[in-house]
Amino acid sequence: MEQLPSNLQVLLQAAEYVERREREAEHGYASILPCDPATPGRRKRQRTNSNPDNVRSVHNELEKHRRAQLRRCLEQLKQQVPLSMENSRHTTLSLLHRAKQHIKKLEDQELRAKSLKEKLRADQQKLRQRLKRLLPPNTERIRTDSLDSSNLSSERSDSDQEDLEVDVEGIILSGNEGELFVSFSAGLEHSYSTPAHAWL
């Protein structure tokens, strides 16, 4: 009979122990499992504790890269946007404001250039139609052919004359050849049939 109460007492103590451990686990005071440094739970906590440092370092590197890229873009923008000489130091806000004004100015210039181009194209078309009405049908073709042939002949004669001038001017005379050229220009008689006398 004494064994039964002892068994009940052991069961009650075990139940109280389990309840106490569960309450401590709910409030975060202790863990249900024993605290062993080699357990996977401890290693998992160590990894979770080190993860914020890794995330912070990655975030810092990305932020550093973003700022460097932003500085490069601002330097390129500063070279393309005309800045006033009033202040040697320009803030990012003033640079962006001037870039916006410069873009608006370029857009206005592009619109004016397009409208002028369309106007000139329309004027050119009107002039072509007027010229076509004023001239007979075959006159323009004959005139074009004559101009092309005259230009071609004049270009050929000019090129031939230039070749002759280059050939004459490009001669470099030595001592004997210079005397021969002077004697020939003075009117002395030289015969090509006796080349031995010509080179004396």
From Swiss-Prot:
The lineage of its organism: Eukaryota, Metazoa, Chordata, Craniata, Vertebrata. The keyword Cytoplasm does not apply. The gene is mxd3. Keywords: DNA-binding, Nucleus, Repressor, Transcription, Transcription regulation. Residues 31-56, 133-164 are annotated as: Disordered. SMART domains: HLH. Expressed broadly throughout the CNS and the eye, starting at neurula stages. This is Max dimerization protein 3. Transcriptional repressor. Binds with MAX to form a sequence-specific DNA-binding protein complex which recognizes the core sequence 5'-CAC[GA]TG-3'. Coiled coil: none annotated. One of its GO terms (cellular component) is nucleus. It is found in: Nucleus. One of its GO terms (molecular function) is DNA-binding transcription factor activity, RNA polymerase II-specific. One of its GO terms (biological process) is regulation of transcription by RNA polymerase II. Residues 54-106 form the bHLH domain. Efficient DNA binding requires dimerization with another bHLH protein. Binds DNA as a heterodimer with MAX. InterPro entries: bHLH_dom, HLH_DNA-bd_sf.
